[in-house]
């Protein structure tokens, strides 16, 4: 039995990805978060393109920080959905455009199905992303009920005037090539912030984050709501840096690259501060939705540029 609260030491690997609960095989039709985001989008949708945002992206600083979020079951629909869920996310982010970005993530989730025993999923990931978006190294491991389930290990490299090449080590050695328009995760967040600051409402980009089996990219659609500048209600977010900082309600839908239908694999919603910190997480898997409340936040120093 997993014990809560989960204590995660600094540097313990972990992150958002398509396989957060893949071990539980729970994916389905996801539409409620997308519709909610669309309802909050100003009339006259403005859609951003990566090319139009490049100049803004290069100037966006991201705050090094460590955040912990408690997960609870917000909504469950249908016979396949769990009757109970709880968990915790620990997120470590540090670095700069000069030296690159290190991201460590752990998500521990306990699900109680309608029938059968409780299932526990424990996912870790550690990534490094070059500050200019030229390379991305990733390592992920998932345990289900204390048994190894999935391992992914590899490196992606943006080739000069060419595609993004991926060298996979696990789950099996493989070399892949994707289009030149693919973004890496931190780069993706910076483009969302650039679009928000430019007053855009929608951003559509292709993303590679090494998730699932490390061999696929996702088409993503991001809806950006009106900016909020009032303090957040949870105590963890009530720090001087965030008190009057703008944040935007953001909803990101992740689709398979093939996109044979219009139903995303899953949808992630959160409030995104202009320094990259997130609060009020909503992870929508179709049959059920998990809410993530920020329980602690620690700002970390960003080392001076070594180049």
Identify the residue ranges that each predicted region occupies.
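N-terminal cleavable signal peptides for secretion/export
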Residues: 36-100, 104-115
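Short beta-strand segments that buttress and anchor functional surface loops
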Residues: 68-74, 105-110, 138-143, 250-257
């Amino acid at each position: 039995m997993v014990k809560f609260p989960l204590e995660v030491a600094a540097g313990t690997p972990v992150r958002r990805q398509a396989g957060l609960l893949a071990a539980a095989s729970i994916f389905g039709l996801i539409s409620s978060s997308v519709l909610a985001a669309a309802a909050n989008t100003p009339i006259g949708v403005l859609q951003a393109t990566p090319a139009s945002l490049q100049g803004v992206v290069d100037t966006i600083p991201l705050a090094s920080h460590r955040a912990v979020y408690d997960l609870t079951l917000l909504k469950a629909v249908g016979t396949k959905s769990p009757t109970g869920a709880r968990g915790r996310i620990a997120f470590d982010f540090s670095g700069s455009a000069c030296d690159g970005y290190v991201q460590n993530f752990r998500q521990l989730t306990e699900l109680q199905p309608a029938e059968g025993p409780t299932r526990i999923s424990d996912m870790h990931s550690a990534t490094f992303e070059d500050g200019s978006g030229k390379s991305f190294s990733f390592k992920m491991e998932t345990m289900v009920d204390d048994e190894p389930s999935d391992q992914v290990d590899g490196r992606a490299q943006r080739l000069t005037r060419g595609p993004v090449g991926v060298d996979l080590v696990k789950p099996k050695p493989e070399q892949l090539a994707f289009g030149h328009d693919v973004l890496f995760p931190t780069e993706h967040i910076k483009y969302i912030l650039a679009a928000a600051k430019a007053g855009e409402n929608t951003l559509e980009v292709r993303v590679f984050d090494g998730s699932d089996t490390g061999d696929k990219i996702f088409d993503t659609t991001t809806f950006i709501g009106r900016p909020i500048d009032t303090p957040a209600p949870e105590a963890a977010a009530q720090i001087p840096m965030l008190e009057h900082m703008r944040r935007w309600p953001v909803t990101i839908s992740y689709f398979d690259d093939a996109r044979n239908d219009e139903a995303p694999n899953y949808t992630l919603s959160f409030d995104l501060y202009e320094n990259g910190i997130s609060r009020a997480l909503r992870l929508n898997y179709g049959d059920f939705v998990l809410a993530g409340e920020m329980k602690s936040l620690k700002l970390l120093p960003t080392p001076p540029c070594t180049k």
